[in-house]
Swiss-Prot record:
GO molecular function, one term: ATP binding
UniProt keyword Aminoacyl-tRNA synthetase present: yes
Entries under Gene3D superfamilies matching the protein: 1.10.10.350, HUPs (3.40.50.620)
Gene Ontology CC, one term: cytosol
InterPro entries tied to this protein: aa-tRNA-synth_I_cd-bd, aa-tRNA-synth_I_codon-bd_sub2, aa-tRNA-synth_I_CS, aa_tRNA-synth_I_cd-bd_sf, Glu-tRNA-ligase_bac/mito, Glu/Gln-tRNA-synth, Glu/Gln-tRNA-synth_Ib_cat-dom, GluQ/Sye
Superkingdom, natural source: Bacteria
Motif ('KMSKS' region): 257-261
Annotated keywords: Aminoacyl-tRNA synthetase, ATP-binding, Cytoplasm, Ligase, Nucleotide-binding, Protein biosynthesis
Name of the protein: Glutamate--tRNA ligase
Binding site for ATP: 260
Gene: gltX
Catalytic activities: tRNA(Glu) + L-glutamate + ATP = L-glutamyl-tRNA(Glu) + AMP + diphosphate
Amino acid sequence: MTVSGTATGVRVRIAPSPTGEPHVGTAYIALFNYLFAKKHGGEFILRIEDTDATRSTPEFETKVLDALKWCGLEWKEGPDIGGPYGPYRQSDRKDMYQPYAQELLEKGHAFRCFCTPARLEQMRETQRAAGKPPKYDGLCLNLAAEEVTSRMAAGETTVIRMKIPTEGSCDFTDGVYGEVSIPWDSVDMQVLVKADGMPTYHMANVIDDHLMKITHVARGEEWLASVPKHILLYRYFGWDQPVFMHLSLMRNADKSKLSKRKNPTSISYYSALGYIPEALMNFLGLFFIQIAEGEELLTMDELSEKFDPENLSKAGAIFDIQKLDWLNGRWIREKLSEEEFQARVLTWAMENDRLKEGLRLSQTRISKLGELPDLAGFLLKSDLGLQPSDFAKIKSPPEEILEILNTVQPDLEKILEWNVETIEAELRAIADRMGKKLKVVVSPLFVAVSGSSRSLPLFDSMAILGRSVVRQRLKLASQAVAALVGSK
């Protein structure tokens, strides 16, 4: 693998999109880049890729930054601290991309496309029906300049697509996969600039990496197939390309892709349950090093010393929660002094005002302080230990309870801002759609979220716990009720 960078030295970046809860996969890629920079005396920067304006939110951006800081990762430049190559948020760089798009058009490396979404969907359906992978068919590829000018003057919506060679292959060396060859005829004529003038990921990514002097691009293997598009853009602009490294995806124990449907994937979930950041980074860092059994407990500095990007495996990194639990326990017992442990517990309990909010809601509901653990203890528990019998006391039959739980889970994912008001509004809407009284819908949720049919107010409790913890508790509740249904 080529390590030498430019005159500025090795520069790597993590470039998350603020479109959802911060994912452990983001921490995994960020840690690799951080260790790579640390190993080679380089610089690690953070850039927010928010070209998807419909899904990106300031709330999610804040959560991403907070989550990566919680992980102990420090960047030299970023949207929160600035730097010499800013802005570090792509939406703030929109005007910077326009001259490059115009350059591609003038040099004949790109073209304007007027195809409507309906026409493109019909094209894809036809291709799929014929057993072909969907990609643009080139209808607008050779439009005359006069027609393009006329249609734009008439106000037709247009995007800019890149031209792709029709023969041969794109051959390149990847830092993990070695020599890679991808036929050009399998590469789509990628949209570079959307109808609203915002660049797509591919366009902005290449331009930003060049302008920010990124020397090594380490990202997930799902981007390997996009490398030909990126290499082509570097060639079109006459720029030196960085070294590409595509890391294997994190997977569940059954080798399936890590997803929130099977395992908790949000960094905030692990923070909320009391995992300590050093243990999570230790766990993720083990995927990047070679060690003997018994040497697993490592600090960030020790991970950096043992870090060896030359020995990365193409096999999927298995996210084994049991191993993470074991490692987290060892960190608590072996790495923290009594004083540090006590401080961590207090910090964790007060994090996100969880304990403060729990106490506020409890004050009018107790007569003795000793009643607090039974009433609000669920806010601090990592596992409620739900059993099928916990749901047997609910008046609704098990089949109806299971239907409610299975309906609520995907619908709650639609909530953009997770708070008491939005949670209540969504649950009321769900009850209306299901044709049920709100009480019928929320009764099993009380048990799922708190472990009891009598607890603190449900909507407040869900807001305090956070989306990722609620998601996991509802999933476990569904499993418990499914067992109850199966036993009948």
